Design a protein with these regions (language model features):
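Long, ordered, helix-rich scaffold segments
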Residues: 495, 511-513, 526, 533, ...
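Hydrophobic alpha-helical and helix-loop surface patches within well-folded domains
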Residues: 207, 238, 244-510, 638-639, ...
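A surface-exposed beta-strand-loop module
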Residues: 77, 81-143, 541-552
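Bacterial N-terminal signal peptides
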Residues: 6-15
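Extended, low-hydrophobicity, Ser/Thr/Pro/Gly-biased non-transmembrane segments
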Residues: 27-29, 33-35, 125-235, 513, ...
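Beta-strand-rich binding/interaction modules
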Residues: 85-92, 468-469, 479-559
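N-terminal, polar/Ser/Thr-rich
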Residues: 18-62, 144-149, 169, 469-470
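Surface-exposed beta-strand/loop patches in extracellular or lumenal glycoproteins
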Residues: 64-83, 176-182, 454, 501-522
Length: 891
């Protein structure tokens, strides 16, 4: 496998940083060292960038930047830049030689002799790369018309891959962009377009200077984009202003411009009211970006969304629509939390991401309460957060960071999913109106500036009259999470003792001290009004004294309302009742959490997978909540196909297939419920342990335009083809080739790439693994999409040979891929394994690589956890465990 030359360049940069004297200057190390950022933040102010770029070349963008700033005393100045080349450097009118000492391919050093006390101006001419992946300017080619579309993506520290700058969040700057592009192209950027000059073959676009923004938020897009503009008020009572949606010309007709523009502007208005600060960045445009590597990016004035998640090729489900709405609300919330007030350093990444997720949920609760938004919040956040926070690779919410080069490792469930859960606990602790007053004060204190988590807690603490220091120590700085076990004793139909015992999921990391938490304990009665008891958990064992003497409930649940943050393990009596009756609980949010509590017991290896599977198969035909049904189906398949060994799977596979087929064909259900069952059926049908005729059924569906009575559109057709390829169905190759001809769109080409990755043969796997690293034309989204197909659980023996190579490439992956890729890479490579031999390989690799960075080691440990649980569950329940047979003949 060939590793690209970036690793060599970084090594050269490190060597140059040491210099000819042999004395290492830590500031010049690759990346953006914290020591450099701290020094610059203390000395540099009033930064302005005037950035000019020429986008008329295929693979590179020549550019020039003028950097203006103030520095109170004469000392050297270091800019960050790791683009393709530097051709000229001028400082305050003085030409500087371009040498290895002035540009070490990571930083540009302006010597003190060229710097003034006070105002300074540095000009650099440079070249930035344009590529499908691994560049600051991403190129995506539309297969339908051959047109190229460009956009930038600079988070967390790729601004210095685009142009020389002070690439740290607490040196905000006013930015003016000037972009030359082909005449047929449009260009959008953070600022509003002010003028366009015409040349013979190009247009030169100039944009207004922005408000102060961090470098990672600078953005532009260029190409033959189509656009739709509407005049909308961005704040209640304000005059209407143009809001523009941009998309590829070939997809614009499919985009729901009216709906999406309204969704964005409604969010801007609601959040402006809630925060007490009107939208702070003037104009608002958003782009549906092709092949975008994640859900969205909050650039002020130019928000980018993932085109694939916003333009549907088949009828969307309610879950998809709610997910799209949540993404919009999340990115719009960032305009205040992240853009208007920004964390000082990426150790406080949670401050923007956690808040954006939490505010999106609060907004959904206010705008669309009928959608049960707190159920959505729980399902989208808590299981994912718990699944990471209970591992040996967990981190605190605040994550120490010595160099922005490692910032990508900080992205993941702790900041995106745990942090909003912690904020929900804080909101519950101080009260909603007090919480709002604190947040408004926080924003007023730091307009267009930077702040830390301590500033936030100080503002909320002042509003509430509480000292939140201990809260910060417990929930922001302490790694890990509590597991709360319920103990219930009764006599003569009355409770004699109800206690909550907590322990750390990872005592080595967290210590054994209890977490302090406010929660609500639910006593549930089928024939009476439930009893809710507020409880302050302050000790290892908390006695719920208010429950003594009350009638014994059907079940107890110690996190009613989802205000607490803990894995709750029900007592045995509650578990027994829930396994039989959880589907009868009417409150959808509570029902979702109860299923989660049962599933946590499976993952703790205290509840047999077969018992959960039996309960799920009895409940699914009656479940009418689309999101719960989807989550339950996913867990059912994990219980039977991953945690259940061959015997259990062989026994249950036909029942599961019939159950899913019946659900997909059930016209009494909503479209989304039926579609989720169909998708699950397609994705899980397998010949791994027994022949199944269901694959032939899937194959026949491709000859028509419906499946189980549902319309058969391109995404579902591709899912069927991928399954046929993965299972070596006789028609697989012919079906794949036919679908390639049928769907020649950009999305069709991506799906074909994914489908072929599923082939269970060594030659295909070798070809894909090499191409992931060696094909510079391969878009990162394509790689990410193909990982799960490549690492199919049923192909673990074939893919095990790539387990260690996948681990060996981690430093390269961290340097060259986007923020979420690292987690997806490890989740697929390690998560696609199920055997003890694979676990042994991971552990041996960790032992053999003590020099591995702590951040990468934690990422490996996070992914390892699911493999370790799989092995432990399979060992504890070699046949899946006991299960009820009372209802076994239902399907």
């Amino acid at each position: 496998m060939r590793i690209p030359t970036g690793a060599v360049l970084l090594a050269c940069a490190a060597a140059t940083a040491q210099g000819q004297t042999g004395v290492r200057d830590a500031r010049l190390a690759p990346g953006v060292p914290h020591v450099l950022a701290t020094q610059r933040a203390a000395n540099i102010s009033d930064v302005r960038y005037t950035l000019t770029l020429d986008l008329t070349h295929a693979d590179s963008a020549p550019g020039a930047v003028t950097v203006r700033f103030r520095q109170p005393r004469v000392q050297d100045v270091i800019l960050d830049f790791r683009g393709s080349g530097v051709s000229r450097i001028r400082a305050n009118g003085v030409e500087l030689p371009v040498t290895a000492s002035s540009w070490n391919r990571a930083h540009i050093r302006v010597p003190a002799s060229a710097v003034r006390a006070g105002e300074n101006e540095v000009q650099v001419m440079f070249t930035a790369p344009i590529a499908a992946a691994g560049a600051s300017i991403i190129r995506s080619r539309d297969a339908s018309d051959g047109q190229d579309y460009l956009y930038t993506l600079l988070v967390p520290s790729d601004a210095n891959l685009l142009f020389p700058c002070f690439d740290q969040p607490d040196l905000k700057a006013r930015v003016t962009l000037r972009i030359e592009a082909p005449r047929a192209w449009s260009v959008l950027a953070n600022g509003a377009a002010t003028r366009v000059d015409t040349t013979e073959r190009t247009l030169r676009h100039q944009f207004t200077e922005t408000q102060p923004i961090s470098t990672y938020l600078i953005a532009f897009a260029a190409g033959p984009y189509a656009k739709v503009s509407q005049r909308r008020a961005l704040a209640r009572g304000a005059a209407p202003t143009p809001v523009t949606m941009w998309a590829r010309a070939s997809r614009m007709k499919e985009a729901e411009a009216d709906s999406l523009i309204a969704m964005n502007t409604d969010a801007l208005q609601w959040l402006g009211d809630w925060f007490g600060v009107t939208y702070p960045f003037g104009k608002y445009d958003f782009l549906l970006a092709p092949a975008f590597p994640f859900g969205g990016m909050e650039h002020p004035g130019a928000v980018f969304y993932n085109e694939q998640s916003f333009i549907y090729r088949e009828r969307p489900t309610t879950s998809q629509l709610l997910g799209r709405q949540a993404t919009v609300f999340h990115e719009v919330a960032h305009q205040w939390f992240g853009d208007y007030v920004t964390m000082r350093w990426f150790d406080d990444l949670w401050l923007k991401e956690g808040f954006a997720t939490y505010m999106a949920a609060k907004m959904q609760a206010a705008i669309a309460p009928e959608s049960t938004p707190w159920k959505t919040f729980y399902l989208r956040n808590k299981p994912v957060a718990y699944g990471t926070d209970a591992t040996a690779g967990t981190t605190p919410v605040w994550q120490a960071l010595d160099n922005l080069e490692q910032a990508k490792s900080n992205y993941g469930p702790i900041v995106y999913n745990k942090a909003p859960g912690v904020l929900r606990q804080l909101d519950y602790l101080v009260g909603d109106s007090v919480f709002q007053r604190g947040i408004r004060a926080f924003l007023r204190e730091h307009p267009y500036g930077n702040a830390t988590w301590r500033d936030l807690l100080r503002a909320v603490g002042t509003a509430s009259g509480r000292d939140l220091t201990q809260f910060g120590q417990q929930w922001i700085l302490r790694p890990g999470m509590p597991i709360v076990s319920q103990q219930l004793r009764s006599a003569n139909g009355r409770i004699t003792r109800l206690a909550l015992t907590q322990r750390p999921a990872q005592p080595t990391l967290s210590g054994n001290a209890p977490w302090l938490m406010r929660t609500s304990v639910l006593l549930y009665y089928t024939d009476a009004t439930p009893v809710r008891i507020p409880v302050e958990i302050t000790k290892t064992v908390t006695e719920v004294t208010a429950a003594r003497g009350l009638r014994t409930p059907d079940f107890v649940f110690a996190n009613d309302g989802d205000y607490g943050y803990a894995i709750v393990l029900p007592d045995s009596a509650s578990t027994s009742w829930l396994l039989e009756h959880v589907g009868e609980v009417k409150d959808a949010t509570l029902r979702a959490m109860l299923w989660g509590a049962l599933w946590d017991q499976v993952r703790e290896a205290t509840l047999p997978p077969a018992s959960f599977a039996d309960a799920a198969m009895r409940a699914l035909p009656l479940e009418r909540d689309e999101q719960i049904a989807g989550a339950l189906t996913s867990r059912l398949l994990t219980a039977t196909q991953r945690y259940g060994r061959g015997g259990l799977r062989q026994t249950l596979q036909p029942r599961v297939e019939r159950l899913l087929l019946s659900g997909a064909a059930d016209t009494s259900r909503s479209y989304g419920q039926r579609k989720s069952q169909l998708d699950a059926l397609i994705g899980s049908t397998s010949n791994a342990f027994m022949p199944t005729r269901m694959l032939d059924t899937l194959d026949r569906w491709l000859d028509g335009d419906s499946a189980a009575g549902l319309p058969l559109r391109a995404p579902t057709r591709w899912a069927i083809v991928t399954r046929l390829v993965a299972e070596r169905h006789p028609s697989a190759n012919a079906r794949l080739q036919a679908e390639v001809v049928r769907d020649s769109s950009s999305e069709g080409k991506r799906q074909a790439f994914v489908a072929a990755a599923a082939a269970p043969d060594s030659a295909t796997k070798a070809r894909y693994f090499a191409r992931w690293f060696n094909d510079s034309t391969l878009n990162e989204e394509w790689v990410t999409s193909s990982l799960r197909a490549f690492h199919d659980d049923d192909q673990d023996v074939i893919t095990r040979r790539y387990l260690v190579p996948s681990l060996d490439t981690l430093p390269w992956v961290q340097r060259n891929r986007r923020i979420f890729f690292l987690g997806a890479w490890l989740s697929a490579a390690i998560g696609g394994q199920v055997a003890p031999e694979a676990l042994a390989q991971v552990d041996a690799w960790l032992a053999a690589n003590p020099q591995l960075g702590a951040d990468l080691r934690r990422k490996v440990l996070q992914a390892r956890d699911e493999l370790e649980r799989t092995v432990r569950i399979r060992t504890a329940y070699p046949t899946g465990g006991p299960r009820s047979t009372v209802h076994s003949d239902r399907f």
